[in-house]
């Protein structure tokens, strides 16, 4: 099993971990109702996807 040769400082550890973060979900606006929605997903407000009615709006 691999073991580190030297102790890694808090500074180096935190610099490395600063890149390990969640990305924000990208939102687009629905072309029909202009509400924010996830891309490539049917709009939960009006129920359209690619200018077609695919689900009944809630």
Swiss-Prot record:
Keywords: Ribonucleoprotein, Ribosomal protein. GO terms for molecular function: structural constituent of ribosome. GO terms for cellular component: large ribosomal subunit. It holds the Pfam family Ribosomal_L32p. InterPro entries: Ribosomal_bL32, Ribosomal_bL32_bact, Ribosomal_zn-bd. Disulfide bonds: none annotated. GO terms for biological process: translation. Belongs to the bacterial ribosomal protein bL32 family. This is Large ribosomal subunit protein bL32. The gene is rpmF.
